[in-house]
């Protein structure tokens, strides 16, 4: 049971101030049973203030009702805080409105709980109690055990017998700009042969070991790899952006230039071959026409078979007559008219290779004798006579 006067030592102490005696006793019982508090109950707020005035430092927690006839709960809270600034007060009220809670907190209360209190609320009261009180109690307990010489001697002996239990202190090395400069200089000298042991020799720093250098070397290489990947990604992105900036017109212009640069297909041999074939066919046609003219005794007009559109002078073949005095009859005609002679005269101001080739063909095929002149060529053909035929 809780005591109304005096505060027993060894446990956390609490005060319950409530004019409702039944509620005050039930609250005191739950505090003792659930939280192992040493509780003091007061039904008069004035007597509670007198007690606090003399024992304020020994009270850890105060639970006070807001609605009391002898003294208002807010006034009690204000005076109690003046007597002891670090005292922890939790207010109880049947009306837990926002206004009541704000006013309690403003005056220095830890929290406002709903009245009547139940076991669940009592169990959660420790959440509103400052843990500094509990820490102070633990400190007091530790301070009480310091004066025991036998305990200290036993602990000293155990540490001496088990030196492995003594943990080594770990310290972290900060890579200053000076160390980083030496580290990079060592890497530049060693190159591919860089190892933590060799780097340490070149750096010449005493307060550093190979493990720390190895860890820093690994981080340095990872950083370089990351920078290279980032640089390559940036380059690829810039190329894609430059290609995407080319518009349709520019791309068409580029394609057109590319097509201009491509070599054109050489069609000249094909055209030359076709021209030679057409000329050969033309020469054959002219040759056949001239033979027909000589055979049937008609005039050969080369203009009908000429393919030259430049308007050159036409070749003319005359059968059985004179041409500009350049050719005469080879034999006189007898009076009876039995002797006949056929002469062919070919005149051309421009002695072309085509006509010459045709004449040569005719001469070779028919056994003609050709005589060339400056202006025209006269060929003597076969004489036909009636006497020979008989």
UniProtKB/Swiss-Prot annotation:
Annotated segments matching region Disordered: 233-271, 303-339
A Pfam family reported for this protein in Swiss-Prot or TrEMBL: Response_reg
Organism lineage string: Eukaryota, Viridiplantae, Streptophyta, Embryophyta, Tracheophyta
SMART domains recorded: REC
Residues in the DNA-binding region annotation: 169-226
Cellular component annotations (GO), alphabetically ordered: nucleus
Protein name: Two-component response regulator ORR29
Cellular localisation: Nucleus
Superkingdom of the organism of origin: Eukaryota
Organism of derivation: Oryza sativa subsp. indica
